[in-house]
C-alpha cells in the first residue's frame, strides 16, 4: 500500500543526485518507493561546461535543461527548494519550503568555490561556480573590450586578464578564452597584441594528474596563443587592482581589469553544519557510500570523500565519479528495498580529458595519453555521454556536443 512505501529523499540535482534519481525511476516501479528530489534550481546545469559559458564561447542556455524534463512524475516528486538543515536523529530535512522526512537519504549537495581564506578573493575575483557566475563573467569580459574600444583615453589594463589556478578548470577556461579573445578583438576593433592573459599557479606543476609530456603540450598550446604562466607563484591577496603574489619572498602587485579565481572547490557548507568529521565540505564514506553510524544515509558527488579500499587518499571530485556513484547508490537502494544489503562501490576509471578550446586538448583514455583533435573528440564524447546517461537519446541529441 502507498503508506508502506519507503521514502527515498535525494538532495541535489547535479551529476550525482540526478543520476541516482533517473536510475531509480528505471529500476523501481511506482509502488516500490516514494522518491523525492530536492534542488534549489528548477534546472540542472552541466557543471563541467561552466568554463565555456564563463569565457563566452558557449551560451549559458546550452548548459541547462529543466529537471522535470528528465524525471517521471508518476515515480519522482520534484521539490524546488533550498536545503537548510539535515536532522539525522529525527530523519528529517528542513528546507525554505517545508520539512521532509525520509527512510533513505541521498546527500548530493554539490560544490561551491573555495578561496582558501585568501584576502579579498571572494570580493574582487570572479568565480567559475554556477550559471549566474558564468553569465556575469562572460558579460564582464565583453564589456571590458567594448569599453576599451569606445573610450578616448585607452587603459590597457582593461585588456589584462588574470586567472588564478592552473588546474583543470583554469586550463580549460584559458583554452576557451584564447578562442574568445580573437572574436572580441574582431568585433570591437581591438589590437589583439594589447591583450594580456596571465595564469598564476601556486603549485610547482600545473595539471598534476597528467604526465610532463601532456602538461608541456598544454603549456605550449596556450603560450602560443598569448597566455603567460607564473608557476610556483602563490597568490596572497586579491584587490581592486588584481592579484598580489609572492615572488622570491617579495610581494608584487599584478594589475588587470579582470581577475578570475579557478583554483579550488569544496563541498556544500551545509555538510559542516550537518555532520561531524567534515573537511572542506566533504565527509569520508564507507565503502558502500553510506556514512559511519548511518546506514540509511548515502553521501555522493562533491560532498563525498570516498577512499577506495587499500588507498590512503579520497578520489577527486569529478563528474565521472559522481555519476558512477549515483548509479551505484540507485542499485543499492533497490537492494535495500528488496531486503538485501547495499554493496561496495568500485570506481572504474575510463580516463580524463582536459579541453584546450573546441578543437584541441590533452588526456588519458584507458591508460593512453592523447592530444590534439583526438583529445577534443573524446572530450565531446564524454560530455555527450553524460547528458545521454541522464536524459537518453533525445536529450543527447538536443544538448550533446555533436
Swiss-Prot record:
Domain of life: Bacteria
Active-site residue list: 172
Catalytic activity, EC: 1.6.5.9
InterPro entries with a match to the protein in the record: FAD/NAD-bd_sf (IPR036188), FAD/NAD-binding_dom (IPR023753), NADH-Q_oxidoreductase (IPR051169)
Classification via Gene3D superfamilies: 3.50.50.100
GO molecular function annotations of the record: NAD(P)H dehydrogenase (quinone) activity; NADH:ubiquinone reductase (non-electrogenic) activity
Pfam families, per database record: Pyr_redox_2 (PF07992)
Localization per record: Cell membrane
Residues annotated as binding FAD: 12-16, 39-40, 83, 302, 319-320, 379
Cellular component, GO annotation: plasma membrane
GO biological process, one term: aerobic electron transport chain
Enzyme class: oxidoreductase
The record's free-text note on cofactor binding: Binds 1 FAD per subunit.
Keyword tags: Cell membrane, FAD, Flavoprotein, Membrane, NAD, Oxidoreductase
Cofactor field: FAD
Keyword field contains ATP-binding: no
Catalytic activities: a quinone + NADH + H(+) = a quinol + NAD(+)
Function per UniProt: Alternative, nonproton pumping NADH:quinone oxidoreductase that delivers electrons to the respiratory chain by oxidation of NADH and reduction of quinones, and contributes to the regeneration of NAD(+).
Family, as annotated: Belongs to the NADH dehydrogenase family.
Descriptive protein name: Type II NADH:quinone oxidoreductase
Lineage of producing organism: Bacteria, Bacillati, Bacillota, Bacilli, Bacillales
Amino acid at each position: 500500500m502507498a503508506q508502506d512505501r519507503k521514502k527515498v529523499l535525494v538532495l541535489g540535482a547535479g551529476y550525482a543526485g540526478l543520476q541516482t534519481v533517473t536510475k531509480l525511476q528505471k529500476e523501481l516501479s511506482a509502488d516500490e518507493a516514494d522518491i523525492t528530489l530536492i534542488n534549489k534550481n528548477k534546472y540542472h546545469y552541466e557543471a563541467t561546461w561552466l568554463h565555456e559559458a564563463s569565457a563566452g564561447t558557449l551560451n549559458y542556455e546550452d548548459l541547462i535543461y529543466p529537471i522535470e524534463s528528465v524525471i517521471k512524475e508518476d515515480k519522482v516528486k520534484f521539490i524546488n527548494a533550498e536545503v537548510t538543515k539535515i536532522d539525522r536523529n529525527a530523519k528529517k530535512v528542513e528546507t525554505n519550503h517545508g520539512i521532509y522526512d525520509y527512510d533513505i537519504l541521498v546527500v548530493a549537495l554539490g560544490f561551491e568555490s573555495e578561496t582558501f581564506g585568501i584576502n579579498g578573493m571572494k570580493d574582487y575575483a570572479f568565480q567559475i561556480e554556477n550559471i549566474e557566475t558564468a553569465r556575469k563573467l562572460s558579460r564582464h569580459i565583453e564589456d571590458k573590450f567594448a569599453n576599451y574600444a569606445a573610450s578616448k583615453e585607452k587603459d590597457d589594463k582593461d585588456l589584462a586578464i588574470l586567472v588564478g589556478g592552473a588546474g583543470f578548470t583554469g586550463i580549460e577556461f584559458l583554452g576557451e578564452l584564447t578562442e574568445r579573445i580573437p572574436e572580441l578583438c574582431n568585433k570591437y576593433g581591438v589590437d589583439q597584441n594589447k591583450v594580456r592573459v596571465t595564469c598564476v599557479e601556486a603549485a610547482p606543476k600545473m595539471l598534476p594528474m597528467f604526465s610532463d609530456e601532456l602538461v608541456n603540450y598544454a603549456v605550449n598550446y596556450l603560450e602560443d596563443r598569448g597566455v603567460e604562466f607564473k608557476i610556483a607563484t602563490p597568490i596572497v591577496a586579491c584587490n581592486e587592482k588584481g592579484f598580489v603574489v609572492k615572488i622570491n619572498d617579495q610581494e608584487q602587485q599584478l594589475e588587470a581589469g579582470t581577475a578570475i579565481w579557478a583554483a579550488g572547490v569544496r563541498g556544500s557548507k551545509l555538510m559542516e553544519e550537518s555532520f561531524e568529521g567534515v573537511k572542506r565540505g566533504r565527509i569520508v564514506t564507507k565503502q558502500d557510500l553510506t556514512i559511519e553510524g548511518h546506514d540509511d544515509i548515502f553521501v555522493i558527488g562533491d560532498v563525498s570523500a570516498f577512499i577506495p579500499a587499500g588507498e590512503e587518499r579520497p578520489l577527486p571530485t569529478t563528474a565521472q565519479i559522481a555519476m558512477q556513484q549515483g548509479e551505484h547508490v540507485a542499485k543499492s537502494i533497490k537492494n535495500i528495498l528488496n531486503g538485501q544489503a547495499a554493496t561496495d562501490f568500485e570506481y572504474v576509471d575510463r580516463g580524463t580529458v582536459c579541453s584546450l578550446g573546441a578543437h584541441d586538448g590533452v588526456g588519458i583514455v584507458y591508460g593512453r595519453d592523447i592530444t590534439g583533435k583526438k583529445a577534443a573528440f573524446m572530450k565531446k564524447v564524454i560530455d555527450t555521454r553524460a547528458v545521454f546517461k541522464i536524459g537518453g537519446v533525445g536529450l543527447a541529441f538536443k544538448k550533446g556536443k555533436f
